[in-house]
Amino acid sequence: MPEAVPNVLSIAGIDPSGGAGLYADLKTFAALRTYGCGVVAALTAQNTQGVRAVHVPPVEFLRAQLDTLFADVAIAATKTGMLASAAVIETTAERLAHWRAQGQSPIVVVDPVMVAKSGDALLDRQAVGALVEALLPLATVITPNLPEAAVLLGRTAPESRREMIRAAEALRALLPTDDGHW
């Protein structure tokens, strides 16, 4: 009997070029032989030169997307990407916690998207606080780049190998553990 294909959810922004965000996640999920599902957390007008506009749908719509999907589809893992506001982050965290308690999405990968590839800032200070306080406690894995790691830790970006190791250890301390051991 063939193995069931795991359903994997991306909660992220839409990059019309397909080079990042929800569309890129879905391509990655397909390449990894999983079935990708997507919840739109933001819409962007961007290209390789920069972000021109960001539209954040109402959190009620985000909640409706999440609840409708989780009520019907068994999600093995969730990856978050661009969550463009504190309200979006808090709603995402609240719904993930709710559905995890129902046995859904035991694995949560948080990509703390804070800066576009063009260098444009995507999160304000309040949203970063919500990310650290509400979403990171649910994370199984986080995938910050060096500038994002610096923001999460409130320090300058690590440059040396030793600084990177210290930053990785500090980031690991932000994640929950089952028994207190890694």
Question: What do the PLM-derived regions correspond to, one by one?
Answer:
Residues 27-28, 171:
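Hydrophobic/aromatic ligand-binding patch that stacks against planar heteroaromatic rings
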Residues 12-18:
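Short, glycine-rich nucleotide/cofactor-binding loops
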Residues 125-182:
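Conserved phosphate/ATP/ADP-binding segment of small-molecule kinases
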Residues 19, 86, 161:
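Loop/helix-junction capping segments adjacent to catalytic residues or to phosphate/diphosphate-binding pockets
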Residues 18-22, 55-58, 124, 128:
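Short, conserved glycine- and acidic-residue-centered signature motifs
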Residues 2-10, 28-118, 122:
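Conserved N-terminal subdomain of the carbohydrate kinase-like
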